[in-house]
UniProtKB/Swiss-Prot annotation:
UniProt source species: Conus ventricosus (Mediterranean cone)
The entry's keywords: Amidation, Cleavage on pair of basic residues, Neurotoxin, Secreted, Signal, Toxin
Protein name listed in UniProt: Conotoxin VnMLCL-033
Tissue: Expressed by the venom duct.
Family (UniProt): Belongs to the conotoxin T superfamily.
Other comment: The mature peptide does not contain cysteine residues.
Propeptide: 20-43
Amino acid sequence: MLCLPVFIILLLLASPAAPNPLQTRIQSNLIRAGPEDANIKTDKRVISGLLASILVPLIDAIIG
């Protein structure tokens, strides 16, 4: 009789402790990947587009 509650408690404690294999594989791949693999390099077009969207309205407001 006492075996069943102990088994259920152990089962509940063990199930969240088991790692998700997909998640651990993705994490290990991200750790091993360098910035060039993840394509983190800044693109000049992105920066120029951001500057243009900020500076053009600012200059228009100053001029008139």
